[in-house]
């Protein structure tokens, strides 16, 4: 399947420039495309993943991808999608952010072989440009009349409180120069980006055309390919939760939390996300959706999505661990979880510390202990929950006549330090014994 056709059936294609000439260009040989990444953070989120994935589809189609790190433009700040001036980052912070982001690309792209991906940093050429050089050789090709029509600029100009600085106003010129530089030095003819970057892409193509004045008419100048905004069906941003962003690296979002995020995607988005985010082929996805339609409660689409995404960024071993943890949590044996997974699974539940020396004494009885947690408010309420069989220790219900007299002991400790208490099906508390 051709590259653009692959993007179309997956719903990843928003706009292109170049028309039929672009298609001819792509099928007539191996080409080079780039996508830029803004180093505002030291890691990438799910929202940053789509362009990386598109670069991988580009690579699988027999073309070469370039990952452009914005070490130069990151010192300026992209005004696109921002209603206020960005806080300028230091050179040291930008360099640190780039180093952190680089961890993600090798999870998706192949950096070896005939179509090996390469990484470049636009600081290598932008920081070498003199101010007068930019004004004379680049700035003269940009019409301010056109630049102020760009949505990100227009919105800021209409905001009397914020406005837009000359620094951010110049971002479009620098991004266009990136495309020109890669066209000159690496024969890169395609820029891939989100739909909000369309205006910047067109500016870069126009700069290339002006630079190539006098070149043969049939020589391809450049083109852009954009993907749609990464949003859920309700319009919300993907990868944002009440507890924060979902990151692509284990130090920011654990494999279990990552897996759970995809498992909890609503039905109306799950099929679309399978196409957008995984590399499963069309027949496989259609078979999964058919299975889901026949038994929606089994959530086949979400399970396939969670497993596929977790395998990409955390490996097949963590997929298995996450599924085992889910089984243990919902009816299995919590004691079977290793210490790392136990910490991941219960990282977000309420927790408190207690004296290990009190285990086996009246102070560690459930009637005394439960009111000190967020599971109940009083000893009376604790007794009611115990009598009703609503309380579980490490996933095992405490029931029968002896429930009220139950006392936690060292035998209940998981990995020597933790006892998990649950009221009902979902209210958990992690007691740490020190």
PLM region spans:
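NTP-dependent nucleotidyl-transfer catalytic core
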Residues: 1-197, 201-205, 212-223
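Conserved nucleotide- and phosphate/pyrophosphate-binding catalytic cores
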Residues: 207-434
């Amino acid at each position: 399947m051709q590259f653009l056709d692959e993007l179309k059936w997956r719903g990843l294609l928003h706009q292109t420039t170049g028309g039929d000439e672009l298609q001819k260009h792509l099928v007539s040989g191996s080409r080079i495309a780039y996508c830029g990444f803004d180093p505002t953070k030291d890691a990438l989120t799910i929202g940053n993943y789509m362009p990386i994935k598109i670069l991988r589809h580009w690579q699988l189609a027999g073309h070469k991808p370039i990952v452009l790190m914005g070490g130069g433009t990151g010192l300026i700040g992209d005004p696109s999608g921002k209603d206020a001036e960005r806080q300028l980052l230091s050179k040291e912070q930008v360099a640190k952010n780039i180093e952190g982001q680089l961890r993600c690309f090798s999870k998706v792209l192949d950096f070896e072989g005939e179509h090996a991906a390469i990484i470049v940093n636009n600081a290598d050429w932008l920081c070498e440009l003199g101010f007068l050089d930019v004004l004379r050789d680049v700035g003269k090709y940009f019409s301010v009349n056109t630049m102020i029509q760009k949505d990100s600029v227009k919105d800021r100009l209409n905001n009397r409180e914020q406005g837009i600085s000359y620094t951010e106003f110049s971002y479009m010129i620098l991004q266009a120069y990136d495309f020109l530089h890669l066209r000159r030095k690496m024969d890169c003819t395609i820029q891939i980006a989100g739909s909000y970057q369309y205006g910047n892409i067109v500016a870069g193509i126009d700069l290339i055309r002006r630079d190539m004045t006098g070149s043969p008419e049939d020589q391809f100048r450049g083109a852009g390919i954009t993907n749609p905004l990464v949003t859920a069906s309700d319009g919300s941003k993907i990868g944002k939760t009440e507890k924060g962003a979902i990151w692509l690296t284990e130090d920011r979002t654990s494999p279990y939390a990552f897996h759970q995020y995809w498992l909890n995607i609503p039905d109306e988005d799950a099929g679309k996300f399978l196409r957008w985010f995984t590399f499963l082929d069309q027949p496989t996805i259609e078979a999964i959706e058919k299975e889901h339609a026949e038994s929606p409660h089994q959530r086949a689409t979400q399970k396939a999505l969670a497993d596929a995404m977790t395998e990409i960024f955390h490996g097949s071993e963590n997929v298995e661990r996450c599924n085992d943890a889910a089984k243990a949590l919902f009816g299995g044996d919590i004691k079977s979880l290793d210490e790392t997974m136990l910490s991941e699974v219960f990282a977000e539940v309420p927790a408190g510390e207690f004296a290990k020396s009190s285990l086996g004494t009246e102070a560690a009885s459930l009637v005394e202990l439960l009111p000190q947690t967020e599971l109940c408010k009083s000893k009376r309420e604790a007794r009611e929950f115990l009598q009703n069989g609503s309380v579980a220790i490490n996933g095992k219900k405490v029931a029968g006549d002896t429930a009220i007299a139950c006392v936690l002991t060292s035998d209940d400790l998981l990995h020597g330090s933790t006892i998990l208490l649950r009221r009902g099906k979902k209210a958990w508390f992690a007691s740490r014994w020190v």
